[in-house]
Curated annotation (Swiss-Prot):
Predominant subcellular localization, coarse grouping: cytoplasm
Cofactor binding note: Binds 1 zinc ion per subunit.
Family per similarity comment: Belongs to the class-II aminoacyl-tRNA synthetase family.
Source organism: Synechocystis sp. (strain ATCC 27184 / PCC 6803 / Kazusa)
Keyword Nucleus carried by entry: no
Binding site for Zn(2+): C296, H347, H476
Name this protein carries in UniProt: Threonine--tRNA ligase
Length: 603
C-alpha cells in the first residue's frame, strides 16, 4: 500500500498525541496565555485550558468579547513572560488548601473544577506570579518555549461545561510548536485548508446549500451535487451486485420499541430526535415513533421475516439509508457533521465458518472503492478487546476467531495496519480505515464491525446442516461511512477538482462565435447519448472569459470550436489535468472520454 510522501520543501509536523514534548509546550503556553490575559484584564476569570491536536485554548469569563487588538496585546505580553524564563513548579496540596487559595482570589470556576477532580490535587506555578489547578504535563521553564513558534489564532464563544444554560465564555485559540519552521508550515497548511474548505468550494461550485427555513445540519443538494451523490451510489451498487449483495429499502421512522430491543434507545437516546407520539398517553408510555439513528434493526427485521437455513447464508442486505442524529448546533460543520445523512449500510448475516471469507471480501470491496476515489494514504486500525476486561459479550473463542479474521484479512491484502487493544465495542471487534488527506489531516473513512450482540438481542437463528438452530454472526459495513461526510472530504482532497468520472459537468464546449453553436450543440447531443455530461457555453462572452469561467467551475475538459474545428470535424481540447492538447478528431475525443470515465482515469 502507498505510504504518505512528504515533498522535500515541506516539513513533517508532529502530532500532540504522539509527542510528549509538544504536549508540554502547548500546555505550558496555554498557561502563559492565561497569565497574560489576567495581567491585562485583571477581572478576567479563567476556566480550563487544555492542549489540542493543533495547539491549545483557554476559556475566560470577561465582561466584553476579546478583539483582534486584544489578541495582539496578549501575544506581546506572552512574549514578555516567556523571556522572563520563569520556572514551572508543580505543587501537590490538600483539597482544603486548594479551596482556601481559590476563595482568596475569588475564582468560582476553579472551585467548581476542584469539586470535580480527584486527589492528588496539583497546582502548577509560573514562577511566583501565577498559578492554576492542573494535572500537567508541563515544561520546566517558560524559557523552553520559542516565542517565534507560537501564535494566537482566533476567539470564539463557548458555554461553560458545554451547557447552553450556563455562562457564555470567551475562548482564545492558539498554537505552539517546537520551531518557527514548524509554525510556518502549519500556517501554510491552514491557509491551504481554507482554500480547500468544502463549505466554501461547495458554494462556489454550486453543489449543496443550507437554508434557515429547513434547519441547521440538513443539507440541500443542488443538481450538480446530486449528480456526484448519484454517481457514487451507482458505483457502489454495481460493485455490490458483483459480490452478491441484495438491495433493501427501509422507512425513516419506527416504533420506539424497536430501538429499545436493539439497545439504541437506552444508549443513544440523547443523540436521537425526540419521540413522536399521537397522544399524551403514548408519550408517557414511550409508545411513539422516532427517526431512525441506525439502519441495522430494520435489516434484522427483514432477516427475521422468514426461517433461514445455512443454505441461505451468507445473506448480504444493502441500503443507502438516511439516518438522523440530534447533533448539538455548536457541533455541526458543513457536510462532515450533520443531523441527517445517508449511510451506505450493509449487514451480512453469516455462519461462524463463513466469517473469514466474508470479512476479507468486505475489506477487498473497501479497497476497490478507495482505489477508484484515488484515496491512497490510509492505514487500518484493528479495534480489539482488552483481554483483562469483562465488559465484552461472547465467548473467548468467538472473539479470537473474529479478531483472527480481521488480522488475516489485512495481512493477506498487505495493508498498513495497527492494533488498538481495548478499542473494540462490547459486542465485537472492528476495522476502521484512517485516511490521511493532502494536508496530512486524518479522517475515518469506512468501517467493518463484527457483531455478536444484536443477533443475541433479536434472537436470530438459522437451521444448521445437522438440523439444529444456531446463531448467525452479523457484519456491519459501510465503505463510504456517510455520503455527506465522504463528499465533504473528497471536495477538500481534490480541492474541488473532481476526476472526470465524478465531475458533475465533464465537458464544456466553447464556440468562438454564435455561428458555431449548432455544431457545438450537435457534439453535446452525441456526448449525452453516450452517457457523458456535457454542455455548451451560450453566454456569448469572449473566448478568454469562457475559458476562465470553465476553470473557475473546475470543468475537467474544455473543447474550443471555431471554423477550423468545424471543417475538420474536430475539437480543440484543453484539460485541467494535462493542459492544451490541441485539435483532436471528434470520434477520438468521444472514445477517449468514454475510456477515461470507464476506467476512473484522468485525461
Amino acid at each position: 500500500m502507498a505510504k504518505t510522501v512528504v515533498s522535500p520543501d515541506t516539513i513533517a509536523l508532529p502530532r500532540t498525541s504522539e509527542s510528549e514534548q509538544l504536549k508540554k509546550i502547548r500546555h505550558t503556553t496555554s498557561h502563559v496565555m492565561a497569565m497574560a490575559v489576567q495581567k491585562l484584564f485583571p477581572k478576567a476569570q479563567v476556566t480550563i485550558g487544555p492542549w489540542t491536536e493543533t495547539g491549545f485554548y483557554y476559556d475566560f469569563d470577561v465582561a466584553e468579547p476579546f478583539t483582534e487588538a486584544d489578541l495582539k496585546a496578549i501575544k506581546k505580553e506572552m512574549v514578555k513572560i516567556i523571556n522572563k524564563k520563569l520556572p514551572v513548579i508543580r505543587e501537590e496540596i490538600s483539597r482544603e488548601e486548594a479551596k482556601q487559595r481559590i476563595e482568596s482570589i475569588q475564582e468560582p470556576y476553579k472551585l467548581e473544577i476542584l469539586d470535580s477532580i480527584h486527589e492528588p490535587i496539583t497546582v502548577y506555578h509560573l514562577g511566583d506570579q501565577w498559578w492554576d489547578l492542573c494535572a500537567g504535563p508541563h515544561l520546566e521553564s517558560t524559557a523552553d518555549i520559542n516565542p517565534k513558534a507560537i501564535a494566537l489564532e482566533s476567539v470564539a464563544g463557548a458555554y461553560w461545561r458545554g451547557d447552553a444554560n450556563k455562562a457564555q465564555l470567551q475562548r482564545i485559540y492558539g498554537t505552539a510548536w517546537e520551531t518557527p519552521e514548524q509554525l510556518a508550515e502549519y500556517q501554510r497548511r491552514k491557509e491551504e485548508a481554507l482554500k480547500r474548505d468544502h463549505r466554501k468550494l461547495g458554494k462556489e461550485l454550486g453543489l449543496f446549500i443550507f437554508a434557515d427555513p429547513v434547519g441547521p445540519g440538513l443539507p440541500l443538494w443542488t443538481p450538480k451535487g446530486t449528480i456526484i451523490r448519484t454517481i457514487l451510489e451507482d458505483f457502489l451498487k454495481q460493485e455490490q451486485i458483483k459480490r452478491g449483495y441484495l438491495p433493501v429499502v427501509t422507512p425513516h421512522i419506527a416504533r420506539v420499541d424497536l430501538f429499545k430491543q436493539s439497545g439504541h434507545w437506552q444508549k443513544y437516546q440523547e443523540d436521537m430526535f425526540p419521540m413522536m407520539a399521537e397522544s399524551p398517553e403514548e408519550a408517557a408510555q414511550e409508545m411513539g415513533f422516532v427517526l431512525k439513528p441506525m439502519n441495522c434493526p430494520f435489516h434484522i427485521q427483514i432477516y427475521k421475516s422468514e426461517l433461514r437455513s445455512y443454505r441461505d447464508l451468507p445473506l448480504r442486505l444493502a441500503e443507502f439509508g438516511t439516518v438522523y442524529r440530534y447533533e448539538q448546533s455548536g457541533e455541526l460543520g458543513g457536510l462532515t457533521r450533520v443531523r441527517g445523512f445517508t449511510v451506505d449500510d450493509s449487514h451480512l448475516f453469516v455462519t461462524p465458518d463463513q466469517l473469514d471469507e466474508e470479512f476479507l471480501s468486505v475489506v477487498d470491496l473497501i479497497l476497490t472503492v478507495f482505489k477508484s476515489l484515488q484515496l491512497k494514504n490510509f492505514k487500518a486500525r484493528l479495534s480489539f478487546r482488552d483481554p483483562e476486561s469483562d465488559k465484552y459479550i461472547g465467548s473467548d473463542e468467538a472473539w479470537e476467531k473474529a479478531q483472527g479474521a480481521i488480522r488475516r484479512a489485512v495481512q493477506e491484502l498487505e495493508m498498513d495496519y495497527f492494533e488498538a487493544p481495548g478499542e473494540a465495542a462490547f459486542y465485537g471487534p472492528k476495522l476502521d480505515f484512517i485516511f490521511q488527506d493532502a494536508l496530512e489531516r486524518e479522517w475515518q473513512l469506512g468501517t467493518v464491525q463484527v457483531d455478536y450482540n444484536l443477533p443475541e438481542r433479536f434472537d436470530l437463528e438459522y437451521i444448521a446442516a445437522d438440523g439444529s438452530r444456531q446463531r448467525p454472526v452479523m457484519i456491519h459495513r459501510a465503505p463510504f461511512g456517510s455520503l455527506e461526510r465522504l463528499i465533504g472530504i473528497l471536495i477538500e482532497e481534490y480541492a474541488g477538482d473532481f476526476p472526470l468520472w465524478l465531475a458533475p459537468i465533464q465537458v464544456r464546449l466553447l464556440a468562438v462565435s454564435d455561428e458555431f453553436l449548432p455544431f457545438a450543440q450537435s457534439i453535446v447531443q452525441q456526448m449525452q447519448s453516450l452517457g457523458l455530461r456535457a454542455e455548451v457555453d451560450t453566454s456569448g462572452d469572449r473566448l478568454g472569459k469562457m475559458i476562465r469561467n470553465a476553470e473557475k467551475q473546475k470543468i475537467p475538459v474544455m473543447a474550443v470550436i471555431g471554423a477550423k474545428e468545424v471543417e475538420a470535424n474536430a475539437l480543440n481540447i484543453r484539460t485541467r489535468a494535462s493542459g492544451e492538447l490541441g485539435e483532436i478528431p471528434v470520434t477520438e475525443v468521444l472514445e477517449k472520454l468514454q475510456a477515461t470515465v470507464t476506467n476512473h482515469d484522468t485525461w
